[in-house]
Amino acid sequence: MAVDLQELTANLVRFYDFKGKTVLFVGAGGRQLLDPSAGTRKLIAIDQDVESLQELKANIVARGWQNSMEVVASNFEDVRLSGDVVYFEFCLHEMNDPQKSLSHARTLAPDIVVYDHSPDSEWIFYGAEEDKVARSAAAMERFGIRSREAFHAEQRFQNHTELLARLAGQGDLAMQRAQRFAGATSIAIPMDYEVLLL
């Protein structure tokens, strides 16, 4: 996993002030870098992965965030809520049509924040996601970027088996590329990422 999730979170909240805002959080079913501790007025977690949302709901209850978080199981393009900001966390590149997703986001909130992989990140090569990331980066360029900041982290794995487990859902090409690390231990793969305000 990334070397320091706290650093990723700190970079996010330093880039954009979420305090007092209603945030439509797209892709919230995975691990969350943004939570109510950022001072949000309301955090609306949106994801279509029901299993991931069940885990998120349990986490919300365990942390006592029931009054500050709402969970919506939906395809993002079907969401008709409004807020101050739409926040995509490492998921815009997974959208079928990133341009359409950004256009829909603009109808829901005046600000759009995207936290995602940089097109030149080595990590996306091993995840076999370079085409998807390039497509979402091009969509953001066309949409109009107000500001951006680039960061560097590393994905670290104890061994090749742990790396393969992380890449399991990425397809055959990712598994083939990961063979470069067969037999290796203490694997570190550079992960460049960006936070953008659209």
Feature annotation, model-predicted:
Residues D84-Q99:
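A short SAM/SAH-binding and catalytic strip from SAM-dependent methyltransferases
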Residues Q99-I112:
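A short glycine-rich, Lys/Arg-flanked "PGG" loop and its adjoining helix->strand segment in the class I
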Residues L24-D78:
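Class I SAM-dependent methyltransferase SAM/SAH-binding core
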Residues A28-G30, K132-L198:
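Conserved Class I S-adenosyl-L-methionine
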Residues W65, M95-N96, A109-P110:
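Helix-to-beta-strand junctions that scaffold the AdoMet/dcAdoMet cofactor pocket
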Residues G20, S82-D84:
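Local beta-strand N-terminus motif with an aromatic residue
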Residues M1-K21, G30-D35:
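Conserved alpha-helix/loop element of class I SAM-dependent methyltransferases that forms part
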Residues V113-R142:
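Conserved class I S-adenosyl-L-methionine
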